[in-house]
């Protein structure tokens, strides 16, 4: 639940994904202590009482790391909020997600009714954030299957941008795939990964 993908904790009563967005999906600062603790424990005679100690130490270190990332995220949100306000952006919702190990690099997405404002911040450098604006283009989803559109919105938790390329509709998901703004010639997109759908002739 601490990653951007989240966990559906309330199934089968609700398909809501709980996600605290404090660590990357692959973060060795969390997994390595657990693995070292487990491997060390397996190397100890199973009849010794001390066998569980390495596992508990690894679990404690990983848990402490998770708690620290919660505090880091709160500070990061304050930084993005201040930078958005400084640049005159009045947003409705704010998403902040780590994009590297150790929760060092973060992307922030300020969402308005019509646009997403995306910026990057490095904890070590403390840089001023430059935001890029992308229109949401929600109306383009009306050209594809309603159920599919609803599923795509659910998966992105509302943080998406839609674009039309030729006869295809692309949905860029900022919640689960924030890799940063990409530029291809004169074409700029909010992140590298996207879902691509070909609308039916009847819409």
Set out the residue ranges of the language-model regions.
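Internal/C-terminal transmembrane anchor helices
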Residues: 49-74
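Cytosolic-side transmembrane helix boundary signature
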Residues: 25-58
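Hydrophobic alpha-helical segments
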Residues: 1-21
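Alpha-helical transmembrane signal-anchor/signal-peptide segments
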Residues: 72-92
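Extracytosolic and intramembrane catalytic regions of membrane-associated proteins
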Residues: 90-93, 100-203
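Juxtamembrane/interfacial segments around transmembrane helices
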Residues: 34-44, 79-86, 103-120
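Conserved catalytic scaffold of divalent metal-dependent phosphoesterases
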Residues: 13-14, 21-31, 63
